[in-house]
């Protein structure tokens, strides 16, 4: 009896403690989740708005190995062969790809990028700069940030045009989306535009962007390298018009495959757009392979770049088979012989 009393008391006390803890947890677990950053909080903040645009840049094409991770794109051509038979890049060599299984199917990616760009364009003017506008000692910073917002808006328009072109390049005429769409609406009856409509939209956007953006990205500092510029907009226009001039990108419903016409005026427009880029006088072929990758992004060939962290992936994927070497890309003799 003496031993049972403390045990029973202990059980009762533990039960009371558990009830107390559970009742206390109720309030704790029911707390409102207040760390979510909504649209209002994003686009009234200069810093958060800047990050939102950076997120749109993430949808630009990845680098040389964007298909198959380890494979350079040349492995899908006659220039090279990838050593790994199961690598996705091999689908292009074997013909084992179709509309349902396409290693380069980027429909979802680029429309996601277009949505982000549209949302940015619609909201960037909401950024609150009163902290600097109302401070006489911060007028220079106020003007800098005001200019940033204008520049960013046209960078987003460039990205939207770029993403549309990437879709047109792969799928032909696609719906041109210039506003943020509701997820609840029915878009099944959305008409497919003509190729000329798509090309006209992208080309026109490039012209408007080129009127605003400078030849140097952002404020001209190293951290801005990779942002859209006037040169990038004109170069995109040149590329778009070049594709548009090809008989392969005509509106096929009006022509048979055996009788595809060639529109000389479109070729002239493409040539003039390319000359407009050349006449900027800031781009040229780089003369030395030895120093091509050694100048910290200062390269006369770069028009639009996507920056990556310092690593040895390129070497690792292409070193001969050994410890730390994959031996992935094997060039053809034809490619070797094409060099002088």
Place the predicted regions along the sequence by residue:
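Bacterial N-terminal signal peptides
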Residues: 12-20
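Second-shell loop/turn segments in exported
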Residues: 37-43, 99-107, 185-193, 224, ...
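Conserved, well-structured interaction surfaces
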Residues: 50, 54-62, 84-171, 187-200, ...
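An aromatic- and glycine-enriched ligand-binding surface/loop that stacks and positions planar moieties
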Residues: 26-88, 174, 199, 227-340
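Bacterial N-terminal signal peptides that target proteins for export
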Residues: 2-12
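C-terminal motif of bacterial Sec signal peptides marking the signal peptidase cleavage site
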Residues: 22-24
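Short coil/linker segments at helix-helix boundaries
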Residues: 131-146, 173-192, 248-268
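Alpha-solenoid helical repeat scaffolds
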Residues: 127, 166, 170-173, 179, ...
């Amino acid at each position: 009896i003496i031993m049972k009393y403390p045990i029973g008391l202990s059980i009762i006390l533990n039960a009371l403690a558990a009830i107390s803890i559970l009742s206390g947890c109720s309030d704790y677990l029911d707390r409102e989740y207040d760390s979510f950053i909504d649209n209002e909080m994003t686009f009234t903040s200069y810093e958060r708005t800047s990050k939102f645009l950076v997120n749109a840049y993430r949808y630009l094409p990845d680098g040389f190995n964007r298909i198959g991770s380890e494979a350079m794109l040349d492995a899908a051509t006659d220039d090279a062969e990838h050593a790994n038979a199961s690598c996705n890049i091999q689908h292009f060599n074997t013909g084992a790809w179709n509309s349902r299984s396409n290693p380069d199917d980027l429909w979802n990616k680029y429309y996601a990028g277009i949505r982000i760009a549209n949302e940015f364009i619609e909201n960037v003017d909401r950024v609150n700069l009163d902290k600097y506008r109302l401070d006489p000692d911060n007028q220079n910073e106020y003007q800098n940030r005001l200019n940033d917002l204008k520049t960013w808006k046209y960078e987003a328009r460039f990205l939207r045009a770029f993403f549309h072109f990437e879709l047109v390049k792969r799928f032909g005429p696609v719906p041109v989306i210039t506003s943020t769409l509701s997820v609840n609406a029915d878009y099944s009856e959305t008409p497919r535009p003509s190729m000329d409509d798509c090309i006209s939209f992208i080309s026109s956007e490039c012209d408007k962007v080129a009127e605003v953006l400078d030849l140097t990205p952002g404020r001209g500092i190293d951290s801005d390298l990779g942002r859209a510029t006037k040169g990038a907009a004109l170069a995109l226009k040149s590329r778009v018009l070049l594709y548009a001039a090809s008989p392969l990108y005509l509106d096929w419903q009006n022509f048979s495959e055996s009788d595809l016409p060639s529109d000389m005026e479109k070729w002239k427009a493409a040539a003039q757009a390319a000359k407009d880029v050349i006449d900027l006088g800031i781009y040229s072929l780089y003369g030395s392979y030895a120093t091509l990758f050694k100048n910290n992004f200062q390269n006369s060939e770069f028009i639009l770049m996507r920056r990556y962290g310092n690593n040895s992936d390129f070497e690792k994927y292409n070193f001969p088979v050994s410890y730390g070497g994959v031996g992935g890309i094997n060039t053809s003799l034809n490619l070797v012989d094409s060099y002088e």
